[in-house]
């Protein structure tokens, strides 16, 4: 069972795996830990990760990046519209109101959803993990931003399904960081809580998390974020600065040229890193646009000045995180900063001023999220034993449930007022389950929605659940218990609906135990029937207080059933009441999510595209094999193979090799795998015999020596007068001698035949034949010459006396297969 953590970043991705010795961040095919989050579509295949990044400059319009900014968001989202303006590829609105990505793939225009593209990237990361673990990877843990909405979380799960992964948990990136920080700490306090602020300034966003640590546990106290404050925003500031400067000085508009924009953005990113350590940074780009070389220079003070609008936004999430946690700056003991954007000196200055202490960098800014994800996966996996460490996560949003009256009442206009109650308030633990009790006479629906969308910029309604049909046996309004679950991924769903009906059952009650039995039954019925009692229905009390909908709104006062309970309590002879539970069907509609059929189709398409990629890679390998064979054989024919082929054959073969080389760069540049395989086999028909003759000449001497040594060894042993061979019969020794003579004669004849042949002729004596002869000789002679001496049988001792008999009895050594009776009989006869 695999234990893998994926940090899917906006710019780069990392893969961490859990092994017996700890957590390792693994290397990709290019021996890098970071894999660019880029999918490039080509005319014949896709290029993903590092290969995609290498193709971006040459193919910008078909290179898809910043996938996390697109997934699970409506096309009309203002933030998405701002992001699209800086993207080199085409993004349009789909029929469902969500973005579609357009690219040329296999020579035709294709449209992909962001979920599909993320699935492609996850599939590539899965391959990296499998190559390092040498096993299939299915179970994993994926890091997501804390601000991801319910729909975005579902989209990540769909992308994982497309990639053939099964996430055990979607964990917030800051929570993963806190886990990686705390699980290795051995000095955490047992009573007093250690409060640590984790600030992640990534490529596109800023996330703040305040966590409280105690020995063996961490508790997330608050989350805060700014979705559009990251390292790329500083890059964009520099890009706009130099684009305007070049427009004035060189009369070129970089923003109108996709390749020029990519080159300038890449240079600005490097410039930002230079300014992190130096007060001044130069910029030089050759042939940026219209064959013009551009130059520029910027000081750190100037950079910070043009970045003021970004820097002013840094304090807001910090203040909100402290406010939600109910802490002051003095209550925060340490500040840990991670992420690529945190290297800007102005950011560190603001953090230092706000917290009154220098931020620490004790964690690897790039790898800590992936390590935390792998640790969380190991904790959830039954195959790994991990140090006991509890993670108490909190939900960053407030979720409410809304409903109207029953369907029959809605038709009559009896349920015009929308009722709602908060089921999962902000900061609610993850996972969690709440139960609500409804009184309905027919099918009805409930909506899962955000209580506050001010910080979300997302539609308030998440999903709608239709509950029913059902029918009460009494013809009255039925009582239904609806369970709402907030799972480990942070996804809210209505889990089940149960119809609760009381029915009376005649039970013969003995006088002795009547009171006790009735009391127990009464308590059980009361616990299940009372709408506002019991731990599992605690949410009913909240719902009643908030909207007063589930009880009196439906015309059935909640106290109506209580006298029945009291009556049952007071009468020992009353019939027993049972609560009959019936599962009620419910249907789910998640707004904007992919349907199951659509996910299955996406899985099939991903399989087809992966197969195409694999075929193209194998085709490249075969083509490279042909090219390599041509160069290698040409060099050897002029060197070590020269004596093993005739002059005429060599000239013809060299001409054939040159012809194949020309074909590779002309007509054969774009052929199928089978054509390259056939071409290589055609060349090997001529080249392999030459190679065989060369190898035979190298190996022949050593194998002949081995056979000669074998012949001489057995001949000497057969003719030896050594006493250790005296037990072997002469006839057997003669057989060995005859076999040695025959092998020697065969070898001599073959050697004479081989000596008359030129090196370019087919060998008469093959090393494989010599090895076989030596093995056959050894197989025949070894059993004869290593036959053990026969073991002399012990003579039965003469029974001259009891003492002698005892000595004869104890003298022979008795193995497990010995027959003791022969030794014991004389002793018995002498007594």
Swiss-Prot record:
Name recorded for this polypeptide: Heat shock 70 kDa protein 14
InterPro entries: ATPase_NBD, HSP70_C_sf, HSP70_peptide-bd_sf, Hsp_70_fam
Deletion phenotype: No visible phenotype.
GO molecular function, a single term: ATP-dependent protein folding chaperone
GO biological process: response to heat
Modified residues (Phosphoserine): 533
Species name: Arabidopsis thaliana
SUPFAM superfamilies: Actin-like ATPase domain, Heat shock protein 70kD (HSP70), C-terminal subdomain, Heat shock protein 70kD (HSP70), peptide-binding domain
Gene name of the encoded protein: HSP70-14
């Amino acid at each position: 069972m695999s234990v893998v953590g994926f940090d899917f970043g906006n710019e780069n991705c990392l893969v961490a795996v859990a092994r017996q010795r700890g957590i390792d961040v693994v290397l990709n095919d290019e021996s890098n830990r970071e894999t660019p989050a880029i999918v490039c579509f080509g005319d014949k295949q896709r290029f993903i990760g590092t290969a995609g990044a290498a193709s971006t400059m040459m193919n910008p319009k078909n290179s898809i990046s910043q996938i996390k900014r697109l997934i699970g968001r409506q096309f009309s989202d203002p933030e998405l519209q701002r992001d699209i303006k800086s993207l080199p590829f085409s993004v349009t609105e789909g029929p469902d109101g969500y973005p579609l990505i357009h690219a040329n793939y296999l020579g035709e225009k294709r449209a992909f959803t962001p979920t599909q593209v993320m699935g492609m990237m996850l599939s590539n990361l899965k391959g990296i993990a499998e190559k390092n673990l040498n096993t299939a990877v299915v179970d994993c843990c994926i890091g997501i931003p804390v601000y991801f909405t319910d729909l975005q979380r579902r989209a990540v799960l769909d992308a994982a399904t497309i990639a053939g992964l099964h996430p055990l948990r979607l964990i917030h990136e800051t929570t993963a960081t806190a886990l990686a920080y705390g699980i290795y700490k051995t000095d955490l306090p047992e009573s007093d809580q250690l409060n640590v602020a984790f600030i992640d300034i990534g490529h596109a966003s800023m996330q703040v998390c305040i966590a409280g640590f105690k020995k063996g546990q961490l508790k997330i106290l608050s989350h805060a974020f700014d979705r559009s404050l990251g390292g790329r925003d500083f890059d964009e500031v520099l890009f706009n600065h130099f684009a305007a400067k070049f427009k004035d000085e060189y009369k070129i508009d970089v923003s109108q040229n996709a390749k020029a924009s990519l080159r300038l953005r890449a240079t600005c990113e490097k410039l930002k890193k230079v300014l992190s350590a130096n007060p001044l940074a130069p910029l030089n780009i050759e042939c940026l646009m219209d064959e013009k070389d551009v130059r520029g220079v910027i000081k750190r003070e100037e950079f910070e000045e043009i970045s003021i609008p970004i820097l002013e936004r840094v304090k807001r999430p910090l203040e909100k995180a402290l406010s939600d946690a109910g802490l002051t700056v003095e209550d925060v003991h340490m500040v840990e900063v991670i992420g690529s954007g945190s290297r800007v000196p102005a950011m560190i200055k603001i953090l230092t001023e706000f917290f009154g202490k220098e931020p620490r960098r004790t964690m690897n800014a790039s790898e800590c999220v992936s390590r935390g994800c792998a640790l969380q996966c190991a904790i959830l996996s039954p195959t790994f034993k991990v140090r006991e460490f509890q993670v108490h996560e909190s939900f960053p949003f407030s979720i409410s449930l809304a409903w109207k009256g029953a369907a029959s009442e809605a038709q009559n206009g009896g349920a015009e007022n929308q009722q709602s109650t908060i089921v999962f308030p902000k900061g609610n633990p993850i996972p969690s389950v709440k139960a609500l009790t409804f009184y309905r006479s027919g099918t009805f629906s409930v909506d899962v929605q955000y209580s506050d969308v001010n910080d979300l910029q997302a539609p308030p309604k998440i999903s709608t659940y239709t509950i029913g049909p059902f029918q009460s046996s009494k013809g009255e309004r039925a009582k239904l218990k609806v369970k709402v679950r907030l799972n480990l991924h942070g996804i809210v769903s209505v889990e089940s609906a149960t119809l609760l009906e009381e029915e009376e059952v005649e039970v013969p009650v003995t006088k002795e135990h009547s009171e006790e039995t009735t009391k127990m039954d009464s308590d059980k019925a009361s616990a299940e029937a009372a709408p506002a009692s019991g731990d599992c229905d605690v949410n009913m009390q909240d719902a009643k207080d908030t909207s007063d909908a589930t009880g009196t709104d439906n015309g059935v006062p909640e106290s109506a059933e209580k006298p029945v309970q009291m009556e049952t309590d007071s009468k020992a002879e009353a019939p027993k009441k049972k609560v009959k539970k019936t599962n009620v069907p419910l249907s789910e509609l998640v707004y904007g999510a992919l349907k199951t059929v659509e996910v299955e189709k996406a899985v099939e398409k991903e399989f087809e595209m992966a197969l195409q990629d694999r075929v193209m890679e194998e085709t490249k390998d075969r083509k490279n094999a042909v090219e390599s064979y041509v160069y290698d054989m040409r060099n050897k024919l002029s060197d070590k193979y020269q004596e093993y082929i005739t002059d005429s054959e060599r000239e013809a073969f060299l001409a054939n090799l040159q012809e194949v080389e020309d074909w590779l760069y002309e007509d054969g540049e774009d052929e199928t795998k089978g054509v390259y395989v056939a071409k290589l086999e055609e060349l090997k028909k001529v080249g392999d015999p030459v190679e065989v003759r060369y190898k035979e000449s190298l190996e022949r001497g050593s194998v002949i020596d081995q056979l000669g040594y074998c012949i001489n060894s057995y001949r000497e042993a057969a003719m030896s007068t050594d006493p250790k061979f005296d037990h072997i019969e002469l006839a057997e020794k003669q057989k060995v001698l005859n076999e040695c003579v025959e092998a020697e004669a065969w070898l001599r004849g073959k050697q004479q035949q081989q000596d008359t042949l030129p090196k370019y002729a087919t060998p008469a004596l093959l090393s494989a034949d010599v090895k076989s002869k030596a093995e056959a000789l050894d197989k025949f002679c070894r059993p004869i010459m290593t036959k053990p001496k026969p073991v002399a049988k012990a003579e039965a001792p003469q029974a001259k006396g009891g003492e002698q008999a005892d000595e004869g009895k104890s003298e022979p050594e008795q193995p497990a297969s010995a027959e003791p009776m022969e030794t014991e009989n004389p002793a018995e006869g002498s007594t």
